C-alpha cells in the first residue's frame, strides 16, 4: 500500500498540470520524513541550531524599585529581621518562583543595598564581607532585565551580560546561580576543558556568559564570542583577578565592550588597580560599602580558635579537632601546597572519608569532588587556596588552617567558607611556636581575637586520628604479598628507635619493630613523616633511578614504593639530597631540617 502511494505521489509531482499534487507532496515530505523516501533521495545535513534573532540590540530598560521596599520596616514586617521579601521586588515571576523553590524568599544586606541602584542601571562598586550572597546581588537585576527584554524582542544569538571571575570554581558557581534562578541560556567558559563545546554553545546563542578572563580572551581571538550587544558587565572578586595575573586580560575585555552598558564591580579589598579600572571604565559609580572602616571582615557567626603544635605533631591533632568542632558536619582543611594536600588526604583517608582539591586535579575530577562534598558523600575536604574564594559550599561547619596563610586577606577568604548566609561556623588556626607573632599580626589586621585551645599531646594514642585503621586495603597491603610492613599493621613502616612522632606513633601510622617486619627507622629518633625505609620494598614496581621515589602520588605504578639504587627510600621527603636531618618535620625533612618539596603553587 505504501509503495503504491509513493509512486502515485511521485507521478503527481512530476506532472506539470498538478501544482496541487506538488503542494501535497511538499507537505507530506517534511524534513522529518525518512531519508530513504524514494521521492527525496538522501537527506540534506541540518543547519547549525540557532536561536531566533531579536530585531535590534536596543538598550534594556530599567525601572526604579520603590524605596519603601528596601526600608528596614519592610524587612521587619515578616520575621523581624533585616531581610527583604523577594515577592515584593516587582521582578519577573519566573525568578520569584525559582528562588522560592530553592528556599530563598528574603534578601541579605548587600543584596537589598545593591538592588535599587542596579535596577536603575547605575554603575556600582560593591564591598562586603565574604559569604554575604554577592551573586544574587547583581544577578537578580540582570536576570530580570534580560527576561523582560527577551519577552519583548525575542532571544538573540549574542550575549547581553558577561561576568568575569578569577577561578573556574567561582565561574561555575556564578553560572549555576543564574541557571537555577531564571529560564535563561547561560554559558560558563574556562580553561582546562575542550574549547569546542563552548564554541558550539556560543554559535547556538546565549544570554549570559560567565568565565575566566583567559578563556574569554581566547574565544574573542577565535571570533566566536561577540561582545557588541553586551549591556551588563560584572567583575566578581576583582582583587583576586589582580592577584592571579588577569589584570591585563580584564582591561582588554573592557576595551572591547560597548560604551553604553552597566558595569558592576565586587571586591573584598580595594588595591590601586581596582581604583584605576573603576575610574577608567565605570561611569560615576555608586559605592556600596558594607564593611567601611570596620576591621572585622569575617562573617558575623564565625568563632575563631588557635592552637599551638609542633610541626611533626600537626597531623595527629587533626582528628580530635575535627571530632570536637565539626560535630559530624563538613570540614575544609587548608594546606599551602598541592603535594601537602595530597599527602594529608591520603593519610586521613585511612580513618575518614575525605578527598583532596587543588589545581593539578583534572576539571572532571574537581567537579566530582565538589559534588560529593556538597552532597555529603564525604565530609572532609583537604584543599589548597583554590577553594578559598568563590566556592559556595553550604553548611560547612569547620575550617582548619593546617598551615598559616600568606596574607591576612587569604585568612579571611579561607575562613569565609564557613558561617555563610547567616549561619554559624568555626575556624581553627594551627601554628608552631615560632609563628606566634604571625598570629598576632592576623589579629591586628583583621580586628579579631582567637580563643586559644589547650595543647593536644601528640603521644596520646587515644587522640591520634590515625590509630584506627578501618580500611581493609591497609591489611591487604600489609601482607607479605605486598611488601610487608611498608603498609602493614601500623602503617607506613616501623620506626625502630625511640618514639615515632607525627604519623609514626607505634600504634598509629608506624608499627613497632617486632610487628612491622620489613622496615626500619632510617636513623632519626623521630619518624620523618610517613617513615623512612632502610630495607627496600619492591611491591609496587621498581625504579632505575638512584633517587628515592617515595610514594610519588601516582597510581601506584612504576616507581612508587620502589627499589632504588642507594637502597634508601626517603618516603615523602622531596628535597634533592638523600641525607637526613635529625630534626623532626612532619612529612619529611631536608638537609636543612625544613620541609622539602612543599614549594609548589596552588
Curated annotation (Swiss-Prot):
- InterPro entries per the record? DEAD/DEAH_box_helicase_dom, DEAD_box_RNA_helicase, Helicase_ATP-bd, Helicase_C-like, P-loop_NTPase, RNA_helicase_DEAD_Q_motif
What keywords are assigned to this protein? ATP-binding, Helicase, Hydrolase, Nucleotide-binding, RNA-binding
Query: What does its UniProt record remark on the domains?
Result: The Q motif is unique to and characteristic of the DEAD box family of RNA helicases and controls ATP binding and hydrolysis.
What's this protein's name? DEAD-box ATP-dependent RNA helicase 53
Q: Give the reaction(s) catalysed.
A: ATP + H2O = ADP + phosphate + H(+)
Start and end of every Helicase C-terminal domain? 317-462
Annotated residues that bind ATP are located at 128-135
Q: What positions carry the motif Q motif? A: 84-112
Cellular component per GO?
cytoplasm
Which family does this protein fall into? Answer: Belongs to the DEAD box helicase family. DDX21/DDX50 subfamily.
Question: Where does motif DEAD box map?
Answer: 236-239
Q: Name one Pfam family in it.
A: Helicase_C
Skewed-composition ranges (Low complexity): 33-43
One GO MF annotation is: RNA binding
Q: Which top-level group of life is the source organism from?
A: Eukaryota
